[in-house]
Amino acid sequence: MRTIYLDMDGVVADWTEGVAEFIGYRLDDPTIKYPDVDWQKIRSHMRLFRHLPKMPQADEMVNLARKIRDDLGYELIFLTAIPHYNDVHWAFWDKMLWAQERYPDIPVHFGPYSEDKKKHCIAGDILVDDRPDNCQSWKEVGGVAVRVTKDYQAALDELEDLYQREQMLLSLI
């Protein structure tokens, strides 16, 4: 069975907005340099991942993924990562709870780290992710990757195109 994997942070959970609410500025602000970011303060927020807001179009993305699951026979899984060195000890549970509260029909699997996601890929599996390196490594092992950028609609359109093409192929069989 093929699988469609949805990343969480940056795809359905708005990590950037959640962190901005906590630290008082946006990490994507061009005037902020990463070495200046108070990572210790971010890591110390004990419920950061659990209380992240949804991305504005998260429900649309999830519903499209559900359509792929239901109509095309894919398995649907959240594939997320824990912070490196597991220095945010509650991230694992927070992410599980976040998904259960919002999308209880979708199981959560962990990379465990971001660069490990490709190990879950079987040729033809789909990954929807916001990190270009994850998308590239996914493609290198035979998967199909849809990258979410600031133009979220482009990712939705690309996933819809994949759905339509596969529907057309199935109709020929």
Predicted regions and their residues:
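General small-molecule cofactor/ligand-binding pocket signal
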Residues: 77, 109-111, 146
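Acidic, Mg2+-coordinating phosphoryl-transfer loop and its flanking beta/alpha structural elements
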Residues: 126-159
